[in-house]
């Protein structure tokens, strides 16, 4: 019986070419990753093996099916595949297809040939099984562009991820990152890793998972939970005894030397909070054996830094999918919640923000609860943080210092999401040291700084608020932080008595006036310590707050640092208000007409924002703010002038956008960075040509930066300055890089351009021709935008000189006819809407790198040139609307999107079947297209195929590829009235089907053959009814019947339906609704035939509608159902509506007790031209007062159409009906259904678009009404009382800018763009952009995207002098990506630097063969990297001098002999150098004979000899003899031969282990000395280094118990002589303090060795090595110091390595290895020399 394995590998086991290579590597990789695997490698085909195979498949969780070239040649293989397919369908077996050496289409061709091969067998079953497996998504395909090892890595990663879905959620992806961080560290040293993250983020879980996976590779391992407590209770020896079984009776020294140092130990210290204990403990463990691993977890990054870990991994929160899976598992016991509970679950997921602890606690709190109970949990969570979560996070807060706590609470209450520089300035004004405090909070995971803003996690934020409230209660400072919830007693009274207590303690006020429960006065006379004042309205930012200001001019507190007051109601500031402490003043949309008047002490003021203050006339006072940095006056329409700010040297930003009365260029200082003048009234800049003004402006713009980029860029924007008609000579602005004159409709000419210009925007200008200077002098231009320049007729000659131009936009240039020349490096070319008649074939070579070509709506274009297939990088071709385009000869092979809608083509080229990457093909409105080529059937599944309105199309299913979304027209002319039966069979598994405008006269019942449909579009057809069988579509979610004008009735619809859109069905009269299963969105707009009583009927069944929706909603918090239909109010007198957009209802106690929800009716009148593409919805605000008179409100947005639906054009008045459950009493009244004053509720309704912005006057609410829905009493009409208030002001919500994350930007790159980014990451250290481009152009790398594009994605920076830089954040990100790449890819990227090997490589690998490299070599190199061995690959080195250098610097040379090795003269040159180092330097050489006999190498015979002779024909006889001798000598060295191994993977493991052992032995000696680069100006330093190098050529096998390998007498004498030379060279220098710090360590160490040797009668190398390993007695060191300085010192016993000294109060780590006492003074500086009289400084040469 076969034991159950996790993975079963199925392949043709008689195919030896993959059984002993690819499959063996795949099996070995699975086992190395801890995944049990069964591979059917036994070549026997008896019944017993078949039984074992079937049993293994049945027990496996994942099956990897390998399609190789001869997979169909074995019946056993086919039967195995059939078994896998059956288990997939019956038992849910996860199947991963792998196409090795062939593609999906070739597999299908083999399937068609099975009948010929096996005429009498079960061919049909085999074929179906093979098709089933081959069509699975997520398959892996081998490619000549990547190695087998990379393919193996991807397969194993994919399988592990699939296995991880059932295990610990999110652990696998994070373990992968940890593995690569560990692989960065050489395997022969003591590796260390820190795991850092906030409390509850999963640090312990991740450390435990890493421990479980890695512990099998170590001789001993221990996991110490809660390290601080364990170490305090048990101490060092107690932990050793408990965790590692060390006998405490043994002395410390013997433990370190005999027990620990000889073992590879895995040590995990979990939850380290205090660094002292951990550093002490780890210092003792510094004597662990090579290859040991230490993992430390902590919430504080500085703890990990003090523990001196080599790498730190920051644990990120779970993503949305992982969070939902964890929450659902904890709450509902399954990985995915029910659909009706999805929205509820996502609320918890969003709140937890990826924190596993919060997700699990919230999930467990919901376990076993009903949906109604779950609602209460949500409300409780919104009001009160869970105690379990709070206790866990509060302990971290308690560990903060006092100032850190203060800064944290200020950030939580006032500065969350604010600019970090602004926050630090405000905090500094309060006496804090903000930079230190914020950095400490970041290190302790309390705050993060993202995109230069201070962010606080939701959980941490709630903890901070709870601490504020609790702390206030404890210390009696209940008013220290004031918001809308506790502001009434402070603000609502007109007078405040001085005797009142608490006012002086108020530190911050944060008032959202839309939430104020009262209207009253606001006064601040006694709030002497108020520092932060923020007043705003979240609902309507432009509405005046309901606050009244007293007449006292001193109403503003004097200690204010931050004043933010939206819609400030007064016309000026009080004269007596002091600004001496104010750092930031924000008053957007204020009523100010002037500022404070006169002069004020404004030295502290940094920023002022008065945007949209439309009454503001003058701001001259700002010129007296010496330290101001930002002035924002955008939208101040009445502002007529801007003061002279030339003397304000700190001013960086000035924004005068849309200040239309500003007529002249403002006077700003040279320090300006951003100057926004868009939409101003500036008419002329010609005056800048005179005097020094132009020079000043040039200086001003030298430091202008883009708003979203860190790198410095010179920008001048005058966009939409429609009055601007003339310009000065722009050449004078030499530093400009971005010039934007878009929309300057009167601008006809520009005299010249700056040479450094990179982006030029001239769209919608009156320019008639492109200036020739642009082509000949502006060589750095990257983007030129001249869209809609209707006067432009042609392009100038010389465009090819613009070698960096990547984007050229000429769309809308309707008079542009001829294009004779284009830049050679274009990536994007836009010519849509131009008058071009032909596309010259001569331009194809110029456009060889183009990625996007847009020729849409070129009405005169008649054809494309032959040779389009040469555009190998073109991925998007747009030809839609080219109505004269009839013929396309060929197409680029790498096309992804092809748009041919509305063209006159009659047929597609047969080559379209070769477009393997094509996923979108648009052929709609191709009225002359008659048929599709048969080759299209070979295409991979398309995402979209649009054949709408192809009226002449005659072929349908026989040539169509598989497609996810099909929008076809009916095909054969005779069948236009219906669809053929074969259509339904061919597309039976389709999920989306569009038959838009297919001219169907009726829908056949055969549509039932498509039961998997989720989306069905039958719009614009001629049928009169929908088949009754539509109700059986159990998965159908969306049904569109728009403009089916003949449709008269609708049958009962599927219960799964969520959307029904029947807009424009003018004949529709009868529907058969099931009120218990209505769609969520019901659209009958422009259906004027519907009966008038339909709304009344719907309202009568409202309780049934709501009741059926409640289980699906899970919580009563969302839209239950919505209707849209022509207004029936004129025909239905039963409806009770109130004129206007607001209404009131009365809820009596009986009604409130059974309240379920509300039905909201809105009648809307649309303008004739209404067609709002931004969508339409209604914002409903519900207001009421509680018994105490406090006001409350709730609001909700109702969308009229489902997301993604097209907004139709609506005629006449329409009514919208919404059934809402969000206003349920437990939500609306916070659980108290009787807490409403006078039973009165007010509803206000506003029309908004999908961005929740007011839609304007295009639609008007004429009537509205609210119906109450009760459990038992049915629906009762709302009261028709006159509303107290009319509709609210227009709602404006700021559309927040989305976060730009590096990972999102990187993921959006194409494959070659990603490669370019990684190349730059390896290359850059301040290279000029043009040099970098030249370097990349000289390689075989094709730049898919320009450097400017990468800069636009914030992945790189381009400095003002053209250097390409990568900031630390991006660089760390690139390193993370590189380390996550497969080994072969990392190796390729590393070659970008031009030096293919790092210095002092461990192993040099020589081999030959590209295909051979993909297979054996890639696996071999990956194994070496995993072992922590630094490698250099010989086939990337072309320079002979570099070959010699690299080989000499390598410790071991590995020569992989294959049959074609001697076919390369480069390999033979490498071999000669290797054998030379073997003879002269004793370098270790390890040959590997891969599928070749060693005797053929020695004798140069066989196939190997033929290649050798062929190579020798091109060289002289002497060279040939040297090659032959090198081959003979190398083949005589003992090595591994693949012919003696059954599996390549086993041989690779053996060789890698041998290499690692040899490296550890060779590094025992060399690690004692730190190599120091010598100063060539000092000859003695050069001689000193030469002596050290010559001395350490001593061979050593690493055995402590046996003597060293035999040494000749001459060698020993030479070693002693070398020591003597070193002593003589450095003695005088050291005595006279002439030695710099970098040499002290080596010199001191060598002196000790020399004196030790002199004390002995004979020189014993074995004793010398023992001396190295165990450390040198400290008294020898002090003796030397005594001899050198003459100062007497008492000898201190013990060993320096162990530090048994008197001064061992603190121990810190030196370098990356051994320890040194902190009691020693710091080493002298480089220029100070060595003070012989100072306290001894121990040589760090001991540190490894």
UniProtKB/Swiss-Prot annotation:
It comes from the Eukaryota. GO terms for molecular function: ADP binding; ATP binding; NAD+ nucleosidase activity, cyclic ADP-ribose generating. Residues 3-163, 1399-1559 form the TIR domain. Pfam families: LRR_13, LRR_3, NB-ARC, TIR, WHD_ROQ1. The active site is at residue 80. The keyword Hydrolase applies. Gene3D superfamilies: Helical domain of apoptotic protease-activating factors (1.10.8.430), P-loop containing nucleotide triphosphate hydrolases (3.40.50.300), Ribonuclease Inhibitor (3.80.10.10), Toll/interleukin-1 receptor homology (TIR) domain (3.40.50.10140). This is Probable disease resistance protein At4g19520. The keyword NAD applies. It catalyses: NAD(+) + H2O = ADP-D-ribose + nicotinamide + H(+). LRR repeats lie at residues 503-526, 557-581, 583-602, 603-626, 648-669, 670-692, 710-733, 734-754, 755-777, 779-802, 804-823, 824-846, 848-871, 892-915, 917-939, 941-963, 987-1010, 1011-1035, 1037-1059, 1062-1086. Belongs to the disease resistance TIR-NB-LRR family.
């Amino acid at each position: 019986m076969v034991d159950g394995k996790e993975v079963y590998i199925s392949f043709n086991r008689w195919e030896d070419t993959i059984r002993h290579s690819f499959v063996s590597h795949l099996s070995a990789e699975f086992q190395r990753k801890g995944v049990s695997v069964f591979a059917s490698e036994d070549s026997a085909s008896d019944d017993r093996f078949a039984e074992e195979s079937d049993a293994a498949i049945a027990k496996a969780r994942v099956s990897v099916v390998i399609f190789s070239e001869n997979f169909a040649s074995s019946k056993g293989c086919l039967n195995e595949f059939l078994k896998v397919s059956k288990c997939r369908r019956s038992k849910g077996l996860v199947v991963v297809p792998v196409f090795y050496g062939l593609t999906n289409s070739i597999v299908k061709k083999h399937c068609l040939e099975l009948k010929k091969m096996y005429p009498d067998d079960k061919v049909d079953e085999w074929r179906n099984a093979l098709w089933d497996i081959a069509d699975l998504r997520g398959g892996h395909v081998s490619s000549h562009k990547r190695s087998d090892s990379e393919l193996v890595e991807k397969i194993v990663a994919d399988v592990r991820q699939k296995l991880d879905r059932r295990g610990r959620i999110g652990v696998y992806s994070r373990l992968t990152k940890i593995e690569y961080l560990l692989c960065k560290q050489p395997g022969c040293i003591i590796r260390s890793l820190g795991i850092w993250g906030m409390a509850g983020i999963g640090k312990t879980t991740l450390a435990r998972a890493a421990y479980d996976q890695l512990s099998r590779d170590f001789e001993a391992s221990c996991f110490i939970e809660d390290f601080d407590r364990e170490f305090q209770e048990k101490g060092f020896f107690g932990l050793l005894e408990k965790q590692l079984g060390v006998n405490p009776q043994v002395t410390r020294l013997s433990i370190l030397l005999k027990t620990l140092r000889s073992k590879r130990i895995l040590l995990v210290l979990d939850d380290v909070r205090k660094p002292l204990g951990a550093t002490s403990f780890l210092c003792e463990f510094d004597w662990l054996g090579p290859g040991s691993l230490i993992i430390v977890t902590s919430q504080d990054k500085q703890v990990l830094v003090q523990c001196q870990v080599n790498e730190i991994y920051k644990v990120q929160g779970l993503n949305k999918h992982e969070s939902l899976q964890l929450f659902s598992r904890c709450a509902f016991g399954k990985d995915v919640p029910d659909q009706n509970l999805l929205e509820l679950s996502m609320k918890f997921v969003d709140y937890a923000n990826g924190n596993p602890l919060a997700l699990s606690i919230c999930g467990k709190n919901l376990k076993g609860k009903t949906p109604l109970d779950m609602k209460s949990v949500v409300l409780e969570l919104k009001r009160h943080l869970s105690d379990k979560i709070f206790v866990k996070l509060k302990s971290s807060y308690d560990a903060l210092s006092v100032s850190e706590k203060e800064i944290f609470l200020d950030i939580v209450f006032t500065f969350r999401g604010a600019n970090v520089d602004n926050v630090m300035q405000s905090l500094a004004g309060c006496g804090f040291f903000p930079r230190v405090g914020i950095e400490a909070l970041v290190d302790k995971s309390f705050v993060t700084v993202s995109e230069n803003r201070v962010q606080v996690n939701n959980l941490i934020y709630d903890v901070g608020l709870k601490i504020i409230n609790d702390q206030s209660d404890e210390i009696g400072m209940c008013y220290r932080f004031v918001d809308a919830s506790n502001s009434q007693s402070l603000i609502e009274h007109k007078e405040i008595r001085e005797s009142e207590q608490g006012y002086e303690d108020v530190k911050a006020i944060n008032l959202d006036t839309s939430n104020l429960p009262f209207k009253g006065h606001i006064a601040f006379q006694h709030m002497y310590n108020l520092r932060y004042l923020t007043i705003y309205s979240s609902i309507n930012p432009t509405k005046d707050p309901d606050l009244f200001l007293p007449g006292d001019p001193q109403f503003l507190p004097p200690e204010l640092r931050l004043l933010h007051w939206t819609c400030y109601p007064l016309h000026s500031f009080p004269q007596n208000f002091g600004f001496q402490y104010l750092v930031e003043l924000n008053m957007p949309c204020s009523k100010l007409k002037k500022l404070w008047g006169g002069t004020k002490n404004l030295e502290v003021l940094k920023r002022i924002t008065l945007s949209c203050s439309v009454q503001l006339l003058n701001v001259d006072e700002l010129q007296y703010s010496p330290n101001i940095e930002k002035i924002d006056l955008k939208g101040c329409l009445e502002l007529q002038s801007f003061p002279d700010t030339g003397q304000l040297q700190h001013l960086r930003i000035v924004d005068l956008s849309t200040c239309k009365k500003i007529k002249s260029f403002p006077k700003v200082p040279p320090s300006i960075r951003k100057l926004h003048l868009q939409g101003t009234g500036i008419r002329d800049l010609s005056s800048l040509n005179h005097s020094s003004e132009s020079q000043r402006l040039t200086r001003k713009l030298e430091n202008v930066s883009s708003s979203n980029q860190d790198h410095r860029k010179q920008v001048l924007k005058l966009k939409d300055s429609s009055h601007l008609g003339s310009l000065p000579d722009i050449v004078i602005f030499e530093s400009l890089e971005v010039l934007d004159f878009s929309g300057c409709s009167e601008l006809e000419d520009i005299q010249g351009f700056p040479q450094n210009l990179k982006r030029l925007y001239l769209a919608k200008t009156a320019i008639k021709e492109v200036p020739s200077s642009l082509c000949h002098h502006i060589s750095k231009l990257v983007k030129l935008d001249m869209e809609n320049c209707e006067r432009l007729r042609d392009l100038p000659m010389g465009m090819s000189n613009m070698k960096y131009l990547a984007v050229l936009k000429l769309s809308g240039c309707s008079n542009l006819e001829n294009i004779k020349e284009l830049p050679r490096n274009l990536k994007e070319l836009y010519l849509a809407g131009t008058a071009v008649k032909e596309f010259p074939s001569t331009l194809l070579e110029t456009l060889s790198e183009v990625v996007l070509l847009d020729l849409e709506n070129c009405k005169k274009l008649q054809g494309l040139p032959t040779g389009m297939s040469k555009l190998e990088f073109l991925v998007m071709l747009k030809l839609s609307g080219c109505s004269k385009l009839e013929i396309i000869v060929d197409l680029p092979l790498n096309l992804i999107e092809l748009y041919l809608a509305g063209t006159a083509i009659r047929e597609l080229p047969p080559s379209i079947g070769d477009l393997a990457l094509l996923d979108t093909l648009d052929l709609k409105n191709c009225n002359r297209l008659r048929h599709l080529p048969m080759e299209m059937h070979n295409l991979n599944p398309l995402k979209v195929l649009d054949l709408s309105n192809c009226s002449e199309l005659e072929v349908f299913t026989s040539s169509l590829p598989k497609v996810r979304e099909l929008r076809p027209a009916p095909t054969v002319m005779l069948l236009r009235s219906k669809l053929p039966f074969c259509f339904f069979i061919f597309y039976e598994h389709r999920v989306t089907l569009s038959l838009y405008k297919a001219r169907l006269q009726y829908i056949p019942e055969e549509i039932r053959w498509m039961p998997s449909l989720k989306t069905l579009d039958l719009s614009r057809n001629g049928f009169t009814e929908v088949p009754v069988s539509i109700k059986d579509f159990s998965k159908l979610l969306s049904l569109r019947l728009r403009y089916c004008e003949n449709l008269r009735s609708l049958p009962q619809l599927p219960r799964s339906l969520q959307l029904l859109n029947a807009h424009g069905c003018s004949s529709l009269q009868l529907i058969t609704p099931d009120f218990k299963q209505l769609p969520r969105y019901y659209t009958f707009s422009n259906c004027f035939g519907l009966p008038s009583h339909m709304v009344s009927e719907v309202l009568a069944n409202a309780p049934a509608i709501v009741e059926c929706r409640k289980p699906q909603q899970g919580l009563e918090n969302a839209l239950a159902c919505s209707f849209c239909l022509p207004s029936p109010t004129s025909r239905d007198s039963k409806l009770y509506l109130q004129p206007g957009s607001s209404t009131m209802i009365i809820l009596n106690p009986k009604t409130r007790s059974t309240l379920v929800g509300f039905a909201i009716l809105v009648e809307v009148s649309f303008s004739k031209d209404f067609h709002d593409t931004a969508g339409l919805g209604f914002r409903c605000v519900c207001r009421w007062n509680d018994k105490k008179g406090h006001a409350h409100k709730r609001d909700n947005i109702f969308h009229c159409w489902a997301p993604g639906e097209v907004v139709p054009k609506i005629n006449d008045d329409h009514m919208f009906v919404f059934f809402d459950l969000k206003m349920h009493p437990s939500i609306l009244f916070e659980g108290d259904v009787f807490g409403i004053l006078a039973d009165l509720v007010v509803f206000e309704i506003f029309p908004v678009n999908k961005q929740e912005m007011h839609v304007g006057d295009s639609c008007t609410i004429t009537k509205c009404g609210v119906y109450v829905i009760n459990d038992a009493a049915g629906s009762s009409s709302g009261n028709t009382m006159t509303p107290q208030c009319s509709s609210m002001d227009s709602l404006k919500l700021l559309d927040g800018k989305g976060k730009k994350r590096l990972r999102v930007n990187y993921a959006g790159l194409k494959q070659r763009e990603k490669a370019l980014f990684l190349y730059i990451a390896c290359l850059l250290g301040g290279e000029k952009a043009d040099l970098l481009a030249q370097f990349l152009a000289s390689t075989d790398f094709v730049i898919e995207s320009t450097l400017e594009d990468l800069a636009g994605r914030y992945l790189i920076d381009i400095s003002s002098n053209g250097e390409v830089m990568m900031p630390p954040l991006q660089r760390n990100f690139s390193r993370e990506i590189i380390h996550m790449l497969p080994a072969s890819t990392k190796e390729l990227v590393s070659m970008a630097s031009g030096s293919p090997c790092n210095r002092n490589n461990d192993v040099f690998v020589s081999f030959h063969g590209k295909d051979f490299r993909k297979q054996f070599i890639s696996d071999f190199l990956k194994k070496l990297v995993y072992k922590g061995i630094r490698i250099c690959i010989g086939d990337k080195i072309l320079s002979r001098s570099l070959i010699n250098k690299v080989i000499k610097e390598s410790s071991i040379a590995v020569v992989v002999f294959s049959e074609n090795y001697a076919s390369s003269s480069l390999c033979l040159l490498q071999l000669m150098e290797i054998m030379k180092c073997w003879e002269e330097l004793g370098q270790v050489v390890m040959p590997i004979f891969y599928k070749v006999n060693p005797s053929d190498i020695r004798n140069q015979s066989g196939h190997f000899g033929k290649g050798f002779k062929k190579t020798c024909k091109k060289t002289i006889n002497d060279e040939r003899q040297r090659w032959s001798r090198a081959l003979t000598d190398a083949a005589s060295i003992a090595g591994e031969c693949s012919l003696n191994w059954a599996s390549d993977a086993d041989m690779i493991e053996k060789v890698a282990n041998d290499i690692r052992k040899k490296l550890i032995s060779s590094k025992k000696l060399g690690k004692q000395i730190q190599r120091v680069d010598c100063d060539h100006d000092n000859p003695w330093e050069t001689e000193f280094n030469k002596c050290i190098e010559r001395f350490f050529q001593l061979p050593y096998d690493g055995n402590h118990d046996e003597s060293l390998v035999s040494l000749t007498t001459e060698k020993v004498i030479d070693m002693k002589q070398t020591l003597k030379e070193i002593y003589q060279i450095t003695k005088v220098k050291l005595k006279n303090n002439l030695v710099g710090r970098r040499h002290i360590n080596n010199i001191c160490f060598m002196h000790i060795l020399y004196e030790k040797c002199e004390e002995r009668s004979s020189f014993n190398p074995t004793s010398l090595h023992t001396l190295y390993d165990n450390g040198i007695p400290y008294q020898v060191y002090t003796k030397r110091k005594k001899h050198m300085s003459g100062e007497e010192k008492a000898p201190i016993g013990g060993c320096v390595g162990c530090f048994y000294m008197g001064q061992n109060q603190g121990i810190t780590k030196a370098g990356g290895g051994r320890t040194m006492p902190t009691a020693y003074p710091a080493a002298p500086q480089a220029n100070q020399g060595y003070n012989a009289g100072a306290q001894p400084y121990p040589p760090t040469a001991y540190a490894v």
